[in-house]
């Protein structure tokens, strides 16, 4: 039986997994006053309890009061959003597929426990590989596809806009460009639809000869490899993705109908079906309201198709290992 969305507006967010990403997400949620209630769940209960104490001690400096506590899966019943940031870390010598196999098993246990509570809200997936784990979460939960969302390429898109803003010396808020596809090496920028203000990027380059089209490829290479560089320098990425997750959460709780490149299921859009992948989508309190199907040029369409095929191939491989994915 498919559950219908709850009409209650408790603005309760449950964070499952408070490693670097989960704890940074909780911290950013409180700092921005997005949620009224924040529940922390982690297999390491001492760590979760410590995070709650640390966060609560900063309540006097937050823009609004957030009720924060160390909870359990029963607290998911009244949650509007459950964010899963739990999972195994990739070890030296492990492949992406090795990591996926471990995290699928973890996610099955987590999602089953959440659903057993009577959860009736929206799943927000942060753990990598996020597109495939978002798909797994939907299968395990049985929730409507629009109510299971992954962080997708929201951070990649933010990185692209930041770097383009630096290059053109324009506020990143007025650079409109998307990164779509897998959150990973097969992601691609949509240069053909990018604009500076309301001016198409291609026209802006023609009007400003100081900027070179060839530089765009270097900029995207830096976007694509940013996570690797940050991991090399500090061991992990967590501030940027935490802020991306908060932005998605705000769109969900505040019913913003905001456009973001989240991981969601396609049903013919962009020529793809039965795959969870990052594309521009309208996000509101019910999850993904609509996928915005942009017109891609031939090169972009080919790259997007390759990204889809890569994800589907990995999906098939996991299916063959015996996981009910």
UniProtKB/Swiss-Prot annotation:
Positions of substrate binding:
90, 96, 128-131, 156-159, 237
Task: Give a GO cellular-component term.
Answer: cytoplasm
What GO MF terms are annotated?
A: L-lactate dehydrogenase activity
Q: Which domain of life is it from?
A: Bacteria
Signal peptide from the UniProt entry:
none
The known regulators of its activity are described as: Allosterically activated by fructose 1,6-bisphosphate (FBP).
| Annotated active site | 183
Which EC numbers characterise this protein's activity in its record? 1.1.1.27
Xref: InterPro entries: L-lactate/malate_DH, L-lactate_DH, L-lactate_DH_AS, Lactate/malate_DH_C, Lactate/malate_DH_N, Lactate_DH/Glyco_Ohase_4_C, NAD(P)-bd_dom_sf
Query: Subunit info?
Result: Homotetramer.
Which function does this protein serve?
A: Catalyzes the conversion of lactate to pyruvate.
Protein's recorded name? L-lactate dehydrogenase
Q: Which organism is it from?
A: Shouchella clausii (strain KSM-K16) (Alkalihalobacillus clausii)
